[in-house]
C-alpha cells in the first residue's frame, strides 16, 4: 500500500500527484496482479483518465474507486465499492489472465472506462456515468462482464509517459 499524502491543494499539484501515482504503478507493475486506488470523488475521473494515457500497454487492471459518504458512516457506499473494486482487480479468465486490462472507475455497481467517465452527482450514490461509452461491467450477485467492450492493447510491454502539462483549462 502506498499513500500520496494529503488532499490536493491546487491544480498545479495535481499533475505532480498524477506523475507520482503513475511512477508508483510503473515501478511496482511486475510485483502485483492489479491495482486498486482509493480516491476522492471530485477529481477521480480526471486522475483515472490521466493515468489511462500515461500508462500504455497495460495487461493488468487499475481500478479507481471511492465513496460519496465517508467510510466511517454506517450507510457508506465505500465498503461495497472497495470490496467490489478488489474483486474486479483480481478477476481472471479461464487462461488465468486478468479480465480487466485497462484503467477503470468502479462506483455503485458500475465499471466505467476511465477516460470515458465523468462525475455527474455530488448527492447520489450513482455519482459517475459514461455518456460516450457503455459500461465495462455491472455488479450484482455476480459481476456481469461485457467482454466485447474491454480494451486489449497491441503493445508488447508497459510504456509510461510521466510528463504532464499544467497549462490545461477545464471548460464546462
What feature does the model see in each segment?
Residues 113-172:
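Accessory alpha-helical/coil subdomains and C-terminal extensions
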Residues 1-20:
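Arg/Gly-rich low-complexity intrinsically disordered repeat tracts
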Residues 66, 105-109, 140, 147:
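Short, structured patches in soluble enzyme cores that scaffold and shape functional sites
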Residues 33-39, 63-69:
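Short glycine-rich or small-residue beta-strand-to-loop segments that form or flank ligand, phosphate
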Residues 71-117:
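Short, glycine-/small-residue-rich phosphate/pyrophosphate-handling segment
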Residues 30-34, 57-61, 98-102, 108, ...:
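Short coil/turn connectors at secondary-structure junctions
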Residues 21-31:
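Short, well-structured alpha-helical segments in soluble
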Residues 37-60:
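Short Gly/Thr/Asp-enriched flexible loops that form oxyanion-binding sites at enzyme active sites
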Amino acid at each position: 500500500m502506498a499513500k500520496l499524502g494529503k488532499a490536493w491543494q491546487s491544480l498545479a499539484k495535481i499533475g505532480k500527484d498524477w506523475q507520482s501515482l503513475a511512477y508508483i504503478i510503473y515501478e511496482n507493475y511486475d510485483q502485483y496482479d492489479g491495482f486498486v486506488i482509493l480516491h476522492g470523488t471530485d477529481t477521480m475521473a480526471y486522475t483515472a483518465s490521466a493515468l489511462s494515457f500515461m500508462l500504455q500497454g497495460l495487461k493488468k487492471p487499475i481500478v479507481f474507486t471511492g465513496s460519496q459518504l465517508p467510510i466511517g458512516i454506517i450507510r457508506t457506499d465505500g465498503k461495497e465499492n472497495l470490496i467490489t473494486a478488489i474483486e474486479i482487480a483480481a478477476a481472471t479468465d479461464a487462461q488465468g489472465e486478468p479480465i480487466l486490462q485497462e484503467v477503470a472507475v468502479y462506483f455503485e455497481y458500475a465499471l466505467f472506462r476511465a477516460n470515458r467517465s465523468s462525475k455527474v452527482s455530488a448527492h447520489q450514490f450513482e455519482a459517475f456515468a459514461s455518456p460516450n461509452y457503455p459500461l465495462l461491467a455491472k455488479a450484482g450477485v455476480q459481476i456481469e462482464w461485457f467482454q466485447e467492450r474491454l480494451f486489449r492493447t497491441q503493445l508488447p510491454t508497459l510504456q509510461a509517459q510521466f510528463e504532464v502539462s499544467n497549462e490545461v483549462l477545464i471548460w464546462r
